[in-house]
């Protein structure tokens, strides 16, 4: 729709690309033309029978009419090339909303708008205005940037890297990354999914879709907009609201997506995942004719999560028998600079046969005694024989070109820099671990939702968005352990509460003769006073005989500090021995893209100083919660470092899960902090809490 033969136009470029290799029928729609590039022109899409896909290349002023016309004609798949939508201001955003409404009305699958187009090499389909078609392959690639698509296809063609599908997502008004991940995950001819993303439309849907696919099909993504400036640029490019970088990092990890920061890594990882098997173990063998590059490669292995393979005694003996006396028969295996291809081949054969070797790097520098082409043939044969991943670094320029092409055609990736080879092998290891993950559904605990709802609605009735210790009942309702305590609004009630908690003191609050008992913690309760310690609104280790006077003192301090503050009372709480455990923090904040993010880390006064925290997208499963506890830097403290008794880690894990359920159940909770969550050998207790709510969500 919008086909034309005008030189330099998008309509002409797409029509020509479709006519080049497409196996199906191409039909042109343009009421002002009789013929375009040898094709008869139809006045309207309704005049054309059995249309599978409509490619819309008309001006913004009539694009909505064209899409509606396609829907009325029974077309179900539309690619909108036209720009001038959400990326171009309020008028464009309004146009994009109307496009979505039309798509909903006619049940249309729409790519774009503001898209470069789509490719499917199995069909010879190139419905883009890019300068060339992609080569066939097993990688499906989506990009939020159309310009990036043209550059990538050109780059990939130069390196014999083929694609199954290429999609320019555009503004993602209807179809987005989640849809294509799900579709390509079901495609037996897609071995790897690659993506360039600036934002995610529906974060929770993407996590769900990617998690279901990633155990069988690797997904590798460059997510730009990591910095504040980058996020701002991405927003202006796509018109999207960006989620936090922390949220993206957590979401992609949970979904089993490999995130990379460079285009080089995106396609390095894609190439090796598409062409090589996964390693059964982490040990890497390095076989080289160059000592210096061998050391560099060894350093790269040390910087990764791989390891330098330890050869068996039998392997070392085989190397000693096969190699010159000057050779290094330990890893990295240096077969000396004069090595012919036969020596390389025998050394690689011995290395791949070692049971401790999971993968190998073949590292060569050009010499007069070595034929790169013969070496490539040997590497291809040995990789096929052992079915273990091999990465090749044939250093040099024109001397390595033909050999690298031979290796690439066999699915063996080639690199000039050995560090890239190691990073790519490490990506295989990482995806192997992802593919072995056992995903479990988050547990649903038996909780008192109505009690929790009443606490939140009570706050809304008071027209307050912030809750402090009065939210302890919310935690109690969800089974999160808290110290014994209650909120009171009278001196006598404070004394009674203290007596109940620890014993001692007189009913009237006067000093008793026998004193006795442990002290209690007392805190002013006011939604208008967040930092209670700053105004002297917290008293610790208060003896029972002083509870009454302390109650009066706390209320007076609060009223003097903020006369118009709402004072709900004073919390009287049992003392918790912070030295008996580790102060941690558990909390959440609500991300615009991914919803509630659950946080765990080292708490108390160290939260903002050390920033030792980790996050997950809720709902959090038991394995996710266990990972959270184990991946903070302070994990050894929890597990008994320096002679300490280990904390009850299962209790901490369950607390994280219950918190996740709470914030998932109540979208009105915008932020929540339990700090400290004291973890001890006997369990975990939420000592203090504060949260913010959105009353409109109740």
For each predicted feature, which ranges?
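Catalytic-core regions of core metabolic enzymes
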Residues: 1-672, 677-698
């Amino acid at each position: 729709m919008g086909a034309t033969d005008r030189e330099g136009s998008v309509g002409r470029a797409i029509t020509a690309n479709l006519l080049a290799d497409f196996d199906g029928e191409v039909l042109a729609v343009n009421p002002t033309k009789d013929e375009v590039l040898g094709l008869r022109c139809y006045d309207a899409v309704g005049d054309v029978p059995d249309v599978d896909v409509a490619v819309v290349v008309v001006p913004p002023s009539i694009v909505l009419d064209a899409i509606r016309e396609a829907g009325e004609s029974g077309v179900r798949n539309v690619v909108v090339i036209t720009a001038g939508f959400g990326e171009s201001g309020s008028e464009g955003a309004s146009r994009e909303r109307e496009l979505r409404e039309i798509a909903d009305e006619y049940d249309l699958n729409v790519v774009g708008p503001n898209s470069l187009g789509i490719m499917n090499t199995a069909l010879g389909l190139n419905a883009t205005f890019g300068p060339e078609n992609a080569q066939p392959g097993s990688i499906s690639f989506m990009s939020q940037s159309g310009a990036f698509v043209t550059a990538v296809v050109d780059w990939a063609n130069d390196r014999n890297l083929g694609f199954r599908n290429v999609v320019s997502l555009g503004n993602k008004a209807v179809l987005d990354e989640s849809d294509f991940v799900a579709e390509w995950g079901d495609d037996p001819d897609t071995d790897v999914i690659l993506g360039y993303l600036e934002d995610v439309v529906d974060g929770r849907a993407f996590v769900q879709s990617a998690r279901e696919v990633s155990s069988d099909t690797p997904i590798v993504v460059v997510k730009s907009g990591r910095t504040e400036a980058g996020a701002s640029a991405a927003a202006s490019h796509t018109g999207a609201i960006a989620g936090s970088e922390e949220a993206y990092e957590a979401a992609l990890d949970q979904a089993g997506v490999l995130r990379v920061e460079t285009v080089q890594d995106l396609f390095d990882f894609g190439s090796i995942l598409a062409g090589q098997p996964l390693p059964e173990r982490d040990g890497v063998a390095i076989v080289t004719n160059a000592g210096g590059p061998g050391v560099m490669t060894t350093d790269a292995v040390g910087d990764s999560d791989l390891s330098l393979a330890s050869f068996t005694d039998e392997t070392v003996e085989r190397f000693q028998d096969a190699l010159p006396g000057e050779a290094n028969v330990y890893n990295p295996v240096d077969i000396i600079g004069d090595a012919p291809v036969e020596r390389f081949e025998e050394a690689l054969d011995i290395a791949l046969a070692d049971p401790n070797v999971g993968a190998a790097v073949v590292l060569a520098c050009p010499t007069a005694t070595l034929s790169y082409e013969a070496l490539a043939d040997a590497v291809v044969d040995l990789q096929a024989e052992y079915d273990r991943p091999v990465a090749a670094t044939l250093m040099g320029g024109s001397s390595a070109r033909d050999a690298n092409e031979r290796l690439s055609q066999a699915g063996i990736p080639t690199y000039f820099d050995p560090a890239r080879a190691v990073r790519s092998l490490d990506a295989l290891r990482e995806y192997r671990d992802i593919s072995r993950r056992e995903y479990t559904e988050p547990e649903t605990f038996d909780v008192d939702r109505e009690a929790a709802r009443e606490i939140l609605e009570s706050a809304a009735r008071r027209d307050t968005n912030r809750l402090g210790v009065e939210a302890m009942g919310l935690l109690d309702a969800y089974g999160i352990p808290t110290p014994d305590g209650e909120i009171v609004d009278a001196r006598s009630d404070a004394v009674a509460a203290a007596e109940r908690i620890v014993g001692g003191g007189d009913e009237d609050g006067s000093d008793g003769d026998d004193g006795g008992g442990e002290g209690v913690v007392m805190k002013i309760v006011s939604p208008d006073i967040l930092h209670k310690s700053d105004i002297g609104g917290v008293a610790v280790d208060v003896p029972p005989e002083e509870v009454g006077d302390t109650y009066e003192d706390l209320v007076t301090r609060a009223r003097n500090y903020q006369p118009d503050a709402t004072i709900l009372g004073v919390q009287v709480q049992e003392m918790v021995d912070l030295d008996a455990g580790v102060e941690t923090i558990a909390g959440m904040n609500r991300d615009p893209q991914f919803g509630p993010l659950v946080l765990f880390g080292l708490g108390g006064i160290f939260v903002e100083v050390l920033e030792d925290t980790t996050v997950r997208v809720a709902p959090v499963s038991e394995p996710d919660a266990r990972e959270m506890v184990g991946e903070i830097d302070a994990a050894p403290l929890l597990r008994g470092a320096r002679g300490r008794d280990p904390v009850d880690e299962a209790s901490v894990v369950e607390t994280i899960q219950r918190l996740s359920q709470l914030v998932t159940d109540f979208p009105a909770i915008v932020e929540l902090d339990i700090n400290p969550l004291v973890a001890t050998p006997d369990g975990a207790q939420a000592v203090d809490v504060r949260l913010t709510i959105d009353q409109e969500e109740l």
